[in-house]
Amino acid sequence: MSLKSKLQRMKGHLVKETDKTASLSSEVVAAGVVGHEPAEFAHESAVEQQATQPLSASTETNPPAQEKEPEIPYADRWEKLQASPYIWEDEHVMIREVRYPIGQKHGAYAFSELHDVIASWEASGKAHPLSAAGRRPEDLLFFDTETTGLSGGAGNTVFLLGYSRIEGEEVVVRQHFLPAPHAEVTLYQSFLEQAEKSSHLVTFNGKSFDWPQVRTRHTLIRDQVPALPAFGHLDLLHGARRLWKAELESCRLGIIEQEKLDVFREDDLPGFLAPVRYFDFLHSQDPDVIEGVLRHNETDVLSLITLYIHMTRLLLHHEREAVSHEECFEIARWYEALGDQAAAMDGYRLVAMSDHSWSNRAKLAIGHLYKKQKNYQQALEVWESCMKSSSYVPEEVYIEAAKVCEHQFRDWDKALHYTRQAYEQWKKRGSLLRNRSKADALAYQKRIERLEAKGRGSQAEEDGLISGLFDWIGDEQSK
């Protein structure tokens, strides 16, 4: 029974005793027992007076004996892991807390650079999914979970809620660990007390996995714990895929750490083993069994800070950072998708002016931007410069040039010329890939026939105009 319940029961007992005493006193007065009392009533009267007196000061200041705190198995080992119990409603969870000075580096960057990148977002004025403009560093909760399974659903339990956050001159890692399934209410109570101090989650696939898992488990106990905060959410996985899908073998966090962040893990427990270790822990209750999971999660939430710093620097300062041409192209494509044509044009030009193999892809994209702006002449000039390069020219360059010549400039001959070149490029590519579609071939042939017909019609019209002109001249001379 909880301490609160015991106090309520004691209060009820005291009220009953007081009522009983008052009733007895009334009966004695009504019977005319005044002045000298018979001996048999003397003792009862003394007891009554004692019962009706207010509680003495010593009684009021000495609360009932506290409930014994739950015994923590292997408490000394938890202490070595920098973890301590959090007790709520007779249940406990473990909270591990590790602090780092803000100037410490994790991989390529110091944690303190988070201040700089937030200021950069503020100064840029750009509307971007990863923007932290208007936020303080402590508003960002770099969050990750560990669960009993890698799929979703109510049967999947979140047993570790981990995050890192800047607090003053330190980066604090906190991990809320579930030592037994029946303590889930206490787990979320402990987490929500801390999480509500921030406004935005920063995760790696958190929109699709981590936070939906938290919401699902929270729904089952929502009447016993506070509501989940209405967090903003910056999911870095989506940005990582935009930037590095074509460049890296995988966009897993571990690969990105090595290739982009200079973070190299030693003796790291693979994430897929976390559920196995947790079930082993439930059997033994020995924290040494789960230590590898805690260390893995700690590195995850620290790497999220480093990754956010790195991605922000690429997005806002790619012209002066050590950015690959592939990254520069993908950054430009991201800005184009967001409707920021000026930023997209800047990125594409950096690639177009290089001798990189993606140069013609960048020129094609620049032409598309000019076309969107209805600057058709500039678009055609960019595409024609692309055709003159010695590197591979995508067939789409010829297709786009043909469309502009046909629909904007009504130059049938030029449109036909570029369409035939596109068809030849398509046949070469299809031969290499063994993937030539009959539908594609038919589409090319129809376009060529249509342009040839337009060309013949244009020539006939021109011949008719010339013939008419000569007839008119002859008529004038005969007058």
Each PLM stretch: what is its role?
Residues 335, 363, 370, 405-406, ...:
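Residue at a conserved register position within TPR or TPR-like alpha-solenoid repeats
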